Regions:
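Generic protein-terminus/edge-of-domain signal
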Residues: 1-66, 70-72
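Amphipathic, well-ordered alpha-helical segments in soluble domains
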Residues: 54-57, 140-147, 167, 171-174
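A short, compositionally biased micro-patch
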Residues: 58-60, 83, 93
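Well-ordered beta-strand positions in beta-sheet-rich domains
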Residues: 71-73, 87, 130
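Histidine-centered metal-chelating micro-motifs
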Residues: 80, 84-90, 109
Length: 194
């Protein structure tokens, strides 16, 4: 696969696509987008290079896809996190597939407070982007998605952007809590073995 010819996917390319109803995706500038599976599942038929951090939670059904040429399967209660610059390709989704998604620009990621050992977490996610969440963790992700989306739709609010950014910061702290429950601890002995 010639990486030069792989289409890049960012927030603006999805919002401005003629295949997508722009009213089904809630955004702030080119920094944050929240959407559901019905919004973008069939947008691209081939591989795409991500320009954003994408977080997805499968609510129903299942899907198969690959990230950087590695195959993965996602089923109900499963979360996937695809990092900027990774190449993702949708393979197949069951007819009953439903999911919720967050997309965050690289520039916004750089402004978020640094949480714990985030670099080690990103290295872990490059190899293990999918994991199953507990019912409580699923509810937490869904609650953030619902509330942030509600705030995104309050277009007349004076501090809409600031409120959404604050909620996203809280969401990233919650994600770090979830990762701590699922990712193996990174210790100095592990690093010395590499």
């Amino acid at each position: 696969m010639d990486i030069q010819n792989v289409p890049k996917v960012g927030i603006s390319s999805v919002v401005h696509s003629k295949h997508i109803d722009a009213d089904s995706i809630d955004v702030i500038d080119n920094d944050i987008a929240l959407f559901d599976s019905e919004s973008v599942i069939s947008l691209y038929s081939g591989p795409s290079k991500l320009e954003v951090l994408t977080i997805g939670l499968c609510l129903e059904g299942e899907g198969t896809f690959n990230i950087n040429l590695q195959d993965f399967q996602l089923s109900s209660g499963g979360m996937v996190i695809a990092l900027p610059s990774q190449i993702i390709e949708h393979r197949q989704f069951s007819p009953d597939f439903k999911g919720i998604f967050f997309a965050v620009s690289k520039s916004l990621l750089e402004t978020l407070p640094k949480v714990g050992n985030l670099l080690a977490l990103f290295f872990y996610l490059k190899d293990y982007p999918c994991f199953s969440l507990t019912p409580n963790e699923q509810r937490t992700v869904q609650e953030y998605h619902t509330f942030i989306r509600k705030r995104l739709r309050s277009k007349g609010d004076l501090y809409r952007r600031e409120v959404v950014l604050g909620l996203m910061q809280g969401f990233f702290f919650e994600l770090c809590n979830i990762f701590n429950n699922h990712a193996p601890a990174v210790t100095s002995s592990v690093r010395s073995e590499e």
